[in-house]
Amino acid sequence: MSKKSIHGLTKGTELEKMASMLAQGEAKGAMMYYALANLAREQGMEDAAAVFTEAANQEANHAGFYAALNGMYPRDFWALVRGLAKAEAAGENSLKKLAERFRAAGLDAAAPDLEIFAAQEGHHGAILQKLLDKYGKNIDTTGKKVYVCGCCGYEYVGDLDNEAENYVCPVCGMPKKAFSLNA
């Protein structure tokens, strides 16, 4: 038995603003708890790090729930997943370069983590692509316009001019003007 959808339940209601604030607050809470986990780990408190990590995972889940309530992401999510797969794959090289920049700036302590994150981003791209393949959701872009976010590599398929002027990249939040037409 499938669960009744919560997608967009608060959209256009008096609860929309509250759900939006909760989504943002929970997302920031996840970030905070992960930062606390890193700090605790650096100080040898693995038990505290585990507690903070568990709290962060739950906060991230809560943020996703509120985002779904407001319909922040499309119900037909496969086009978004395709763009995410591209952005995640592009993120691998971007983070490798960032690790090099950290080393060049004498910030060696952070570089190994950035390299781990780079590999994880590449892995995310690969597993998302496997989902697209499994469910037959790859999009044939032949003859279609493809716009690429200059920040994260997210690909928008279609006519970006049809989107509102306040359109932002669903991955990194960059404005519409950050996209360029992929020739």
Regions picked out by a protein language model, each given a short descriptive name:
Residues 1-183:
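Non-heme di-metal
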